Amino acid sequence: MTTIRRSFAITGLLGLAVLMAGSAISAPKKGYIANIEALTERNQDFRRVLYTGKHMQLVVMTIRPGEDIGEEVHDSTDQFFRIEKGEGELRIDGVASRVRSDDAFIVPAGASHNVVNTGKAPLKLYTIYAPPEHRDGIVRATRAEAHATDAHFDGKTTE
């Protein structure tokens, strides 16, 4: 084999090795950093997925006066809520509790639950699903749209 061919073969193999190694190396994770209070208060959408990790998901929601999230059960997902603005009623397995700005609550997996806006202004909250519940990046402007086109988590994360 001539020197030129040998050099080309070695260079080609090295290039292939680098290419293959590069595909195995993942980019550094960035995570998610934001002023969640400001994002929650500015949000106008019924549901907006901000970040989806492998084991949890951050979502902001706005519930209009007189509306609710909708009675639901997540069999294998725990859910944390924090109310930033407004007032409402939380129902967990038929037990109702009043909730308002600065309240936080957790709904365990398997519990039937709903959040109803009982106030005159939009109810602004953020929620954390563990594990994720919705497809990453989903934005649903209204409750009707969210219920008509619900897209469950497909395994794809934000990063």
Predicted regions and their residues:
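Short histidine-centered beta-strand/loop micro-motifs
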Residues: 48-50, 61, 70-74, 116-118
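Structural motif
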Residues: 80, 87-89, 96, 112, ...
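Short, conserved beta-strand element in jelly-roll/cupin
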Residues: 62-64, 73-90, 128
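Short acidic-glycine-tyrosine-enriched beta hairpin
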Residues: 95-109
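A short, N-terminal "cap"/entry segment at the start of jelly-roll beta-barrel domains
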Residues: 4-7, 16-57, 70, 136-159
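Ligand-binding loop in jelly-roll beta-barrel domains
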Residues: 109-135
